[in-house]
Amino acid sequence: KSPYYINKADFVACHNPSYIVKNFPMVQDVKPGGIFLINCQWDFEELNKHLHADAKRYIAKNNVQLYTINAIDLAVKVGMGKRTNTILQAAFFALANVLPKDEAVKYMKDAAEHSYMKKGMDVVQKNWDAIDAGAGALVKIDVPADWANATEEAHVEHLEGPEKTVAMVRNIMEPVGRMNGDSLPVSAFVDYADGTFQQGAAAYEKRGVSVTVPEWTSETCAQCNQCAYVCPH
């Protein structure tokens, strides 16, 4: 165990496509020649659109093997609902070469039977189908040569609100939200040395990580406010 994240990995997987859109620094943790797997519903054109230039350059210049898998739709198809974990675990074993693929699939199916047999063979079969789907639905992406020189215009989102709150969001919350908090200098926290943060910052914490979003129907809403209580952002 280590107190720090691994930053020279043979295999890194992004299980939520919103992290690609937000440009989280994930692929940079893959060592040259390693594997990067993205769980998404995109074809190559959409992937090319959503991947940021710095990620493209790193992939191309470091010979990173790029794969995608649509575990989101596969989970629904095999009856697992929104549970993609079993599919993605099978995809990991199919790519990472920790165990021979067939052997890993057998072990996973044995574990699924042991864990879910009390819930019935139907549940076990769904997990077996998820394992087979994850091991066989990988898409290898041929990395274009021009990714090595990919560029894009810098985009700075306009934020409205109290000046001090916007400054805190821009200088601290956004880097931390992009998993770049370790890069912040001590000087960034001078105005917050006593631990006090500006109020109203939750309004800027739009993570956007859900694949599906419920639609509010005013005609049937009972105004219980439980939706806002459960998800204040």
Predicted regions located by residue number:
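Active-site cofactor/cluster-binding pocket
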Residues: 1-175
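Beta-sheet entry/capping signal
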Residues: 12, 35, 213, 228-230
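Broad hydrophobic/π-residue packing in well-ordered secondary structure
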Residues: 75, 143, 186, 209-212, ...
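Ferredoxin-like iron-sulfur electron-transfer modules
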Residues: 154-155, 200-223
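Long amphipathic N-terminal alpha/beta scaffold segment
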Residues: 156, 166, 190-192, 200-201
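Conserved oxyanion/phosphate-binding beta-strand-loop segments in alpha/beta enzyme cores
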Residues: 178-198
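Iron-sulfur cluster-binding cysteine motifs and their immediate structural context
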Residues: 201-202, 226-233
